[in-house]
Amino acid sequence: MKKKRILIASIIFILITCIVTAVFIIKNKNRSTSNTVYTYSNVNPDYNYSEDNVLYLDGSGILHLIDTVSGKDIVYCDKPNCTHEGYSRTNQNPSCPAAFYGLSGAVIYNDHLYFIGNMSDEDMTIQYLYVMDSNGENRKKTAKLENVQHVKAVLYRDNYVIGAYSNSVELNDEGQIINDDKPEAGIFVIDLDNYKVYMSDKITSEQANITDIYYENGAVYYSTVRFGDDVTELMIEEGATADAESFAYDNMLNGIYQYDIADEKTTCLTEIDHINNLRLLDGDGYYSSKDGYFVFDTESRQTRQLPIDADGKTQYGPLKKSGDFLYYALSEENSDEVTYYRLKDDKSEELMKLSTEKAFGIENICGQSVYVNYTD
């Protein structure tokens, strides 16, 4: 059985056109770790990427750090003689400072380690912001997030903690499930100066979810996906049985919202139907449809078509952006090759071709480090 893997590699970005097919870890002499910025993973929310390292939780909830210079994968624990045992029914209070319990990853920010989750198993609808020393010791609960069941992605920017969440069930005051089909999603913001919590308006309806978040100048931009209000769970089940892809294309709504933190105001900038793979890249919405590739500018609220020739081709992996460049890959019908491109100023440049056996998707671009996923 083929398995999808994330290749943890650091590649000097100017060489992407010729060497990203191999596993290289190259040292950047000008690297600095004093202002490390982490970006969450769209594939695994417990992975957080930076130019210098990757933080992730393993299957036991133990925090690891992968250094992109040495390639070493180490447990994030400096406690002598620690066995690094994670949370379990028989070990509900692990002593290892690298042990976490939750769906989002831990991140180093402002010389502290931060984590959002519920490690006391008190209430499935409550999450906490844990703040601790940079080595994971001296943990304390600070902000409390109520009616937040599943944390999807978290960013730490400008002394804010910004996260996306989704809920699936409704509970009564005794913690009993009274409705097992109440999908809703939204974003939260925690001000690290005073731990005040801000909550956006929620989106509702079947399979409501947040797919991307982005922060800039006191505002949070986020992309959403949901079925229309007239689509029922039964219709989704029947549509999935007949042709899931076509049903989703015809009935799924994709939105882009803005949440102004100071004004505590949620604004729907656009909601689009009959599209594929909406991605929020540097705050703008990139997507494809049967008519081609498009970008929605969140500042002007205008949509324009991108000069990407995809006739008879299938997109391979997600779109990614770094600076002024948009990276994408296409495979032609009845072909065993994937072609990689980058687009700037409406001009596409072919970078390379790879066989489908060696092809990869770009997982994240952080400065001069490129992380890719592949199948083996």
Task: Write out the residue ranges for each language-model feature.
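N-terminal Sec-pathway targeting helices
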Residues: M1-L15, F24
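Sec-dependent signal peptide cleavage junction
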Residues: V20-T36
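A short beta-strand motif characteristic of beta-propeller blades
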Residues: T33-Y40, I74-C77, N81-P97, N138-K144, ...
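Repeated scaffold domains used in trafficking and secretory/extracellular systems
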Residues: Y38-S50, E85-V107, N147-D158, S205-N217, ...
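Residue position within the beta-strands of beta-propeller blades
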Residues: Y56-D58, Y114-G117, I162-Y165, Y221-T224, ...
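A short loop-to-beta-strand structural motif that recurs across blades of beta-propeller domains
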Residues: I62-H64, Y128-Y130, G186-F188, G255-Y257, ...
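Short loop/turn segments that connect beta-strands within beta-propeller blades
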Residues: D67-G71, D133-E137, D191-Y195, D260-E264, ...
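Short, conserved, GDST-rich strand-edge loop motifs in beta-rich repeat architectures
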Residues: N118-D123, Y165-K182, V225-N251
